[in-house]
Amino acid sequence: MTDNTRLRIAMQKSGRLSDDSRELLARCGIKINLHTQRLIAMAENMPIDILRVRDDDIPGLVMDGVVDLGIIGENVLEEELLNRRAQGEDPRYFTLRRLDFGGCRLSLATPVDEAWDGPLSLNGKRIATSYPHLLKRYLDQKGISFKSCLLNGSVEVAPRAGLADAICDLVSTGATLEANGLREVEVIYRSKACLIQRDGEMEESKQQLIDKLMIRIQGVIQARESKYIMMHAPTERLDEVIALLPGAERPTILPLAGDQQRVAMHMVSSETLFWETMEKLKALGASSILVLPIEKMME
């Protein structure tokens, strides 16, 4: 019998978002064994169940109220939303926040030896895709008619196999397209992972747990986007040094024993510190510059 007091979260069992989703949950302090073949895993330290399913099942599980939360790519979520609307449904859910992983783009690609004069080049052509609704919305907005060839995998082989004239598929680096004699010609949708919540009344205990998780997720993402920086900086150029390192708060300044010309400076910077920035700090007279990762952060 299902325990309705436990928070149910759906995530991809294996694939593009699986490892990052697992890492996010672990860094939020959820102790759970996700290395087994079980489809439902129970957290050891929180009333949370993790459902490990196919990524294209996650939006439906949330929209139908089977699970409370889902970690899903925006591309899969939007495709399911358009699919349900096309069937006359009114799907409901909340997007709690965009996450900092799973970045990709849904793009049109054509054979490298064919001319490309913009989307109108696809008028009347057959296009292979796993995202027919996103493709249709984009080309309808352009006033372009086309024939759709629905494939659930290996979309990139369609032109060589004579199944389609072009494809619409996810692209990360473009290496797979190149290996199949294709080139990316148009980006139609940019996507990242996101966290969504089912619509409807939520038990107070569950909502409190969701609120706690949201604070932790914010801390994890903020920590990944920030660095802890320590250095010795000349007092006369302190303002210039601080200007190079944007942060949420002012830095901590500490005196150096026996040195009136320099101070020790500690701060959290919200920007990734590149070599160019470190070279500028060095040119201002800073020394002993240390840049450290942050595991957890809460403002």
From Swiss-Prot:
The protein's enzyme class: transferase
Modes of activity regulation: Feedback inhibited by histidine.
Supply one GO molecular-function term.
ATP phosphoribosyltransferase activity
Any idea where this protein resides?
A: Cytoplasm
Provide one Gene Ontology biological process annotation: L-histidine biosynthetic process
UniProt protein name: ATP phosphoribosyltransferase
Stored CDD domains:
PBP2_HisGL2
Q: Which family does it belong to?
A: Belongs to the ATP phosphoribosyltransferase family. Long subfamily.
Gene name per UniProt: hisG
Q: Which organism is it from?
A: Escherichia coli O17:K52:H18 (strain UMN026 / ExPEC)
Q: Which EC numbers does the record give?
A: 2.4.2.17
Q: Which Gene3D superfamilies match?
A: 3.30.70.120, Periplasmic binding protein-like II
